Amino acid sequence: MKKYIGERIKRNEDPRLLTGEALFVDDVNIPGMLHAAFLRSDYAHANLLSIDITQAQERPGVVAVITAEGMGDEWQPGPPNVSPPPTVEDITFHSRTQVPLAKGKVRHVGEPIVMVIAESRYIAEDAVEDILVEFEALEPVADIESALDPQAPLVHDDLDSNLACHMIQNKGDYQAAKAAAEVIISRVIEIDRGAAAAMENRGIVAHWDPKSQHMTVWDTTQAPIPIRNGLASRLGLNQSQVRVIAPFIGGGFGPKMMMHYPEEILLPWISMKLGKPVKWIEDRRENFVGTTQERRQVHDAEMLLTKDGKILGVSHTFLHDSGAYDPYGLTLPLNTESHATGAYDVPNYYSDLTVVFTNKMYTTPIRGAGRPQGIFVVERLLDIAAKELGIDPIEIRLRNLIPPDAFPYDRGIIDQAFSRLIFDSGNYQPAVEKAAEMIGYEEFIRDEQPRLRAEGRHVGIALVPFVETTGVGPYEGARVTVEPSGKINVATGVGTQGQGHFTSFAQIVADQLGVDVRDVNLVSGDSAEFHWGTGTFASRGAVVAGNAIHASATIVREKVLKLASKLLETPEEELELEDGFVRVADIPRQSISLGDLAAEANPLRGAVEPGTEPGLEATAYFGPKSGATAFGVHAMIIEVDPETLMIEIKRYVVVEDCGTVLNPLILDGQVHGGVAMGIGNAYYEQL
C-alpha cells in the first residue's frame, strides 16, 4: 500500500491558484451588489465636534451614509476575545474593545468614522470626500514609555490612566538568586512595531436574503466559525441563519484572526438594512492603518549567571503596546513572558508586565504572536554574557539547554491559554550542533572571519535556538466521507491562507483509505459545510485539525473494512486498501471498489441494521490538553557595510525539530516564509 505521509507531493491547490480558478473574496460578484467605502480618521487622537454628511447623501449613486449616531442602539463595542487569567491573583485588567464607527472621539489614525454605501466603489470613494468632519485635535499618546505619566492624555476618558493591564509572574526565588550571582547582565531592549502586510488585503462581501432570512458572508478571516457565531449574536440571528465562507486567502499571519473588525460587523448589518449584497475590499493604505499590528515592547531585562556561564535567573520588567484597544487581552504579552527564558533551564524567573493603551492601531497576534520578543530578550542577554565572560556563544547555550531527561519540563508559570506552561518533550543539543555544523561555525570563527576582517570587511555569525508553544486548543473537528464516485470528501472548519492544507490533509486521509492523494477533496472554512471549530492560527492546522481528520479517517477505514469483510466473505485482517479498492491480500482479483462500498452502505431497500448507520462517513474532534512545543535553531553569517550600514546575508541555516513531517515540500515553504518575514521584522520594518 502506497504511503503519502512524508512524501514531497506537489500541492493539490496549486493548479487552481496558478490558473486563476481559485475563488478569493474579491472574485465574488452578485447582481445588484453595492459597495462600501470608509471615511477614516487622519488624527491619532481627536474629539469629533461635528459630522456633515449632507453632500455625500446627495451625490448620485449613493445609497446610504452611516455614522455612529445613525446606528442608534445597534452601535456597541465588540466583545473581548480574551479575558484575564482567572488563576492569577496579582493582576489589574481593563478591557476596552474596538467600536464599529467612532463616536465622539477618534483614538487612532485609520479609525472608521463614516461608512458610505454606493452603487460602485468609485462613487463611494468620491462621496467620502464630500463628508465634512470638524475635529478638535488632542495630544496623542504616541510612546509607551510616557503613556503612564500622570500628565499623559487619556486614550479612554473613563479610565484613570492608560493602564490596560499589570501582571506579575515568578518562579523560584529571584532575589536570593541575585544575591548569589557572580555575574549580572542588565540591558534595556526595545522591539519595534510592525505590520504583517499580507499579499491580499482584507475584504468582505455580505449578502442578506430577505426571502430566505439567511445571511451569507465571504470574509478573509482565519476564523470563519467564530465570526459566524459573533455575527449571529450581534445581528439577532440564529447561527443556522448565518453562513461564513473563508475562501482562498492570500496570507493571514494573525491579523485576519481578529474578531471582529468594524467592517465585519458593519457590512452584514447594512446588508440586512438594505436587503442587498454589499462588498468592501481594503486598499493598501487602509491596510497600514486599519489592520492590526504587533511587536512593540520595551524590556528592562536582567540575567543572573555564575562565572562559568550557568544561568541562575532571568527577570524583565516590560511595557507592551496594546494600541487604542485591547481585544486580545493578554495573549501577546503572556506569550512573551512564556518565552523569555527560551530553551534554557532557568530555575528563577521574575516577570513584571505592563500593557498600555496608546493612540495607535490596536495590536493582535502576528506570526509568532509575542513569542519572538521573549526569545530575542533572552538570546540578546546570552550573547552579552558570553562576550563578558569570554565564553563561546554556542558553548554558553549548550551549558544551559533544558536536558532531555527534564521533560516534561514545567516552567512554573501560566501561558496564554491560562494553563500551566509545560514543555512536553525535546532533545535540543543535537539540533544546535547540527546547525553549527551546517553553517561551518568552527571554520568561520577559526579561519574565515579573521581573514575577512583583515581585509577590512565586517562579518559576523550568530546561532540562536528557539522554542515555540504551538498547536493550542480548544479543538477542531472534521468529517470524512467516501462518495459513490470513489472519491473522498473532507470537511473541516479551519480555513486556509496558503499553508497547503488541501494537500497535507489529503495525505493523512489517503494513507488511511488507500486512495490517491488527488482523489481527496477538501472543503474548508465554510461554516455551512462544517459547523464547529476555532480557526487557523498558532501553527495549529496540522496538529489540531490534522489529528481530527486522522481520527475521522480511521473510523471510516474501520467501516470500510467491516462492510467489505461482509461482502467479500473474508476476515478484516486479510483485507488491504489500495488504489481505491479493498482487496483480499492473497487474491488481488477478489476486490470491491470504495465507490461500490459507499453505494452498498446507503441501501435503497431494507432496514438499517441496529447499531449501524448508512454511508461511509465519520465526524471526529481533537482537543489537545496543552500545546505542542516546537524547537529549532537559526544560524546566520552576515556582512555589514560600515559606510552605508547596508547588510548582506552570506549564509543562512535553519534546523527544525519537526516530529512527523507530513510533506517536506510544504514544510520547506513554511520555513522559507518564516525566515523572510523574520528578516523583514529585524531589518526593514518600523511603524
Walk through the language-model features, giving the residues of each.
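Helix-loop-helix junctions that connect adjacent transmembrane helices in secondary transporters/permeases
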Residues: 84, 149-235, 403-487, 507
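Thiamine diphosphate
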Residues: 248, 252-275, 279-281, 501-509
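Short, well-ordered beta-strand elements within core beta-sheets of diverse protein domains
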Residues: 35-48, 112-118, 367, 378, ...
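Gly/Pro-rich active-site capping loops and adjacent beta-alpha segments
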Residues: 2, 73, 96, 107, ...
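Glycine-centered tight turns that cap/initiate beta-strands
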Residues: 61-64, 241, 308, 519
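Short, well-structured alpha-helical segments that form the helix of a local strand-helix-strand
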Residues: 392-400
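Flexible, low-hydrophobicity surface segments
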Residues: 1-161, 184-187, 273, 600
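Glycine- and acidic-rich phosphate- and metal-coordinating loops
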Residues: 241-249, 280-282, 522-523
